Amino acid sequence: MTLLSVHNLRAYYRTKAYGISRNVRAVDGVSFDLYPNEIYGVAGESSCGKTTLIKVISGNIKPPLKALEGSVNYNFDGYKVDMLHISEDELRRNVRWKQISYVMQGSMSVLNPVRKVLKTFEDIVDTHERITDKKAFLEQMRIHINRLGLPTEVLNAYPHQLSGGMRQRVAIALATVFQPALIIADEPTTALDVVVQRGVLHMIKNIQAMSHNTVLLVTHDMAVHANVADRVMIMYAGRIAEEAPTESIFNAPLHPYTQHLINSLPVIGKKSTKASLKGSPPNLADPPSGCRFHPRCPYVMDECRTVVPELITVKERHRVACHLVKEGSL
């Protein structure tokens, strides 16, 4: 049974510059499935469409962003949601936080600087379930954060009194207060030192193991995916380049872009300079024809410049969009 099924999703930003209107094709024909009880990673360079994708699948579709085509369907144990056609009222009352929660990039974006952490918990919970017994609520929140490894004192603190790592842990605790079926984490380790990153990732893994929910982890850091994710999707210029179990992505990458991402990771004991990828990501308001990676690809063929490669299944749970793979050249 799938938790989320995304089919042929196209989500564009409508922009206007110098009197000319145009579409920025941030997500362009994306299809994938999420299953219960897994950690699914989404990786790629800045401006590849990662954040736009999670905006759409979480129902945060506001101008200038518009979903033009495709479907985003959830199945929460029989409660089915069509995210592209759900009303804002139903989304707020029945889906956000209760079924889908969102750990935003940068914990200070979530926490109100003039309210104590407990008050922020109250604001979220009271939106869905009327708090009638404050003492019982306090005890429930104490148990919740202690279970996640946070001290009780955090509840009585203001955000500025906490370290960056502690604030990020609080943001994750807020996202899990209703034990939702899907947790979307957008760059949860950004701006944290490596020791704190390890603690945050350990917390995410523990939550998923305890609650058996699904985590959609979005980060450009391939090392994070290597340590946490069960499956990884590689995005490039608004499209899926490759999707596979984490072990396959790292040990047998098929797409040239995925190969570059893996080869760019530092290796302990080796001091050689890593080869950089020529060029820059394309302008999504005027993307190149054919495969969008072809201007930077070291293996480019004539077909790559004119024909969009299909996302094909090469073996179980391993999909790739590359003419070279189809031809058996990689």
Which residue ranges define each predicted feature?
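Short catalytic/signature loops enriched in Gly
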Residues: 80, 243-330
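ABC transporter nucleotide-binding domains
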Residues: 1-251, 320, 326-330
